[in-house]
Amino acid sequence: MNASMPRDGALLVNAPLHIALAAGGTGGHVFPAEALAGELIRRGHKLTLITDKRGHVYGGTLGLLDTKRILAGGVAGRGVIGRLRGMIELAMGSLQAYGLLRRLRPDVVVGFGGYASVPTMLAAIRLKLPTVVHEQNAVPGRANRLLAARVSRYAVSFARAERPRGARPVVVGMPVRPSVLALRGEGYDAPRPGLDFRLLITGGSQGARVFATLVPQALALLSPAHRARLRVTQQCRPEDIEAVRATYEAQGIDALLSAFFSDLPERLRDAHLVICRSGASTVGELAALGRPAILVPFPHAIDDHQTANARGLDEVGGGWLMPQAALTPQALAERLGELMDDPDVLVRAAQCARGAGVPDAAVRLADLVSATADHRVPEMPPKEISA
């Protein structure tokens, strides 16, 4: 027995566990793995990261882990040859993962969705190892749809998340990076009439080209008084930076542009308003810090999961869902002008966003992982989690 469960539902670990994390791909799959890894390391567990051969060299907590790389291939959105190649890579990766897990014999294997996790999770299921998958989005991705009914426990970020057939979800919330969670204690600094208005525009881990054209056009439509107040921080793709900078300079708008901000959590903390995509990690971080946002879902996401994510925050009053198809410079300028003129609306939205956050999501997920390794299920109080 590795763990025991006291009456309050918190898990007490008696012996270190060996836990394998299967993660890779975009930040939406990697950031919750990083958050969980930090909590598990704090508890004294041994971790191994299993990712795909094309994966990034990770920094932060994941960069400190013993890392194994296997083949993995996706099939969604690819042509016939691409799908065939993906299926071959999936089969070969599953064989590699099977041999790796037989050798490592972890106490539990945890997956975070995306094609990079599938070979390892299929191998773990075949070996009858305890397994957990965490679904970040309100609409599950194809990888977790495949796995949800087969794994030991299926954890979700949203209480109203779509439930795959045969799955029994456990709501834990969206684990956010420790660097973000550390700033949760710093409250929302409401903008003051006539003074600086800090606007953060970020397109997520893959950037958002539409923001490079639409946002500068919208800001140019604001009144001179509004433009003079703006302090813009914008993430752009490298090839877009010079054009965006020229537009802002022509309008006299103070702007800092970069393809990457290493201090993005601090910039998120300092923002009066955020314009962003609505990936699960982004929505989770907005809620953790309590920052109001205009949410523009990526319209080409499979199953349109970003719209479902954004709707959760919009419905509790923590942000404003603006679909890209209906978003024009005029519509965005009108919304921005209204918000800049009414800071009380932003304050209320910040409070609503914060109320939707689940700051202990990494702890909840770590409890579930530890309990699954010991064939127990922790008692988690129900909570309507919207972000």
From Swiss-Prot:
Alphabetic keyword roster: Cell cycle, Cell division, Cell inner membrane, Cell membrane, Cell shape, Cell wall biogenesis/degradation, Glycosyltransferase, Membrane, Peptidoglycan synthesis, Transferase
Pathway: Cell wall biogenesis; peptidoglycan biosynthesis
Enzyme class, UniProt record, top EC level: transferase
A GO BP annotation: peptidoglycan biosynthetic process
Keyword Ion transport tagged: no
Binding residue positions for UDP-N-acetyl-alpha-D-glucosamine: 26-28, 137, 177, 205, 306
Cellular location(s): Cell inner membrane
UniProt catalytic activity: di-trans,octa-cis-undecaprenyl diphospho-N-acetyl-alpha-D-muramoyl-L-alanyl-D-glutamyl-meso-2,6-diaminopimeloyl-D-alanyl-D-alanine + UDP-N-acetyl-alpha-D-glucosamine = di-trans,octa-cis-undecaprenyl diphospho-[N-acetyl-alpha-D-glucosaminyl-(1->4)]-N-acetyl-alpha-D-muramoyl-L-alanyl-D-glutamyl-meso-2,6-diaminopimeloyl-D-alanyl-D-alanine + UDP + H(+)
Molecular functions (GO terms): UDP-N-acetyl-D-glucosamine:N-acetylmuramoyl-L-alanyl-D-glutamyl-meso-2,6-diaminopimelyl-D-alanyl-D-alanine-diphosphoundecaprenol 4-beta-N-acetylglucosaminlytransferase activity; undecaprenyldiphospho-muramoylpentapeptide beta-N-acetylglucosaminyltransferase activity
InterPro entries: GlcNAc_MurG (IPR006009), Glyco_trans_28_C (IPR007235), GlycoTrans_28_N (IPR004276)
This enzyme's EC code(s): 2.4.1.227
Recorded GO CC terms: plasma membrane
Membrane-topology descriptor: Peripheral membrane protein
CDD domains in UniProt: GT28_MurG
Functional note: Cell wall formation. Catalyzes the transfer of a GlcNAc subunit on undecaprenyl-pyrophosphoryl-MurNAc-pentapeptide (lipid intermediate I) to form undecaprenyl-pyrophosphoryl-MurNAc-(pentapeptide)GlcNAc (lipid intermediate II).
Recorded family membership: Belongs to the glycosyltransferase 28 family. MurG subfamily.
Annotated protein name in UniProt: UDP-N-acetylglucosamine--N-acetylmuramyl-(pentapeptide) pyrophosphoryl-undecaprenol N-acetylglucosamine transferase
Source species of the chain: Rhodospirillum rubrum (strain ATCC 11170 / ATH 1.1.1 / DSM 467 / LMG 4362 / NCIMB 8255 / S1)
